[in-house]
Amino acid sequence: MSQTQPPAPVGPGDPDVYLKGVPSAGMHPRGVHAPRGHPRMISGPPQRGDNDQAAGQCGDSGLLRVGADTTISKPSEAVRPPTIPRTPRVPREPRVPRPPREPREPRVPRAPRDPRVPRDPRDPRQPRSPREPRSPREPRSPREPRTPRTPREPRTARGSV
């Protein structure tokens, strides 16, 4: 590989320098996106998260750039299931002792009932006589003559309209 042109001297004060490789969304020198006169006008290698608009899009916020294998160890308390803090039980007032009960009297078995006296036998029931045909109903009072019913309208499935 022959170099056709010598590499340009890269100094700490050169704001136009890109890192090796194709410039991507986050490969700009520090302060490129900062407005003029912004206090973050620092020259040097680009740092993700330094006022970099692309840092949020690329998934690298720049907060944890220590190393890929760095994991934040959890304290041992975080592994245990959380316990709800219980309020200490308030001791109840001591119960007032009751006076002792009188001892129960033992149950005395009841005297056996006297045997039932048989009832006097009745005559067997006479079979019912067939009903006599009733006389036709008497008409209602004369002041209220019966009027024939008017037929109702047939109901529809939708209900009354």
UniProtKB/Swiss-Prot annotation:
The keyword Phosphoprotein applies. Residues 1-12 have a biased composition (Pro residues). The keyword Lipid metabolism does not apply. Sequence repeats lie at residues 85-90, 91-96, 97-102, 103-108, 109-114, 115-120, 121-126, 127-132, 133-138, 139-144, 145-150, 151-156. Residues 30-39 have a biased composition (Basic residues). Its main location: host cell. Residues 1-161 are annotated as: Disordered. Keywords: DNA-binding, Host cytoplasm, Host nucleus, Host-virus interaction, Inhibition of host autophagy by virus, Inhibition of host innate immune response by virus, Inhibition of host interferon signaling pathway by virus, Inhibition of host MDA5 by virus, Inhibition of host PKR by virus, Inhibition of host RIG-I by virus, Inhibition of host RLR pathway by virus, Inhibition of host TBK1 by virus, Inhibition of host TLR pathway by virus, Interferon antiviral system evasion, Late protein, Phosphoprotein, Repeat, RNA-binding, Viral immunoevasion. One of its GO terms (biological process) is symbiont-mediated perturbation of host cell cycle progression. May be phosphorylated on Ser residues by host kinases. Plays a role in the inhibition of host immune response. Participates in the inhibition of host autophagy by interacting with and inhibiting host PKR/EIF2AK2. This interaction also prevents the interferon-induced shut down of protein synthesis following viral infection. Downmodulates the host RLR signaling pathway via direct interaction with host RIGI and IFIH1. Associates with endogenous HSP90 to disrupt the HSP90-TBK1 complex and induces destabilization of host TBK1 through a proteasome-dependent pathway. Belongs to the simplex virus US11 protein family. The N-terminal tetrapeptide may be responsible for virion incorporation. This is Accessory factor US11. It comes from Human herpesvirus 1 (strain 17) (HHV-1). The gene is US11.
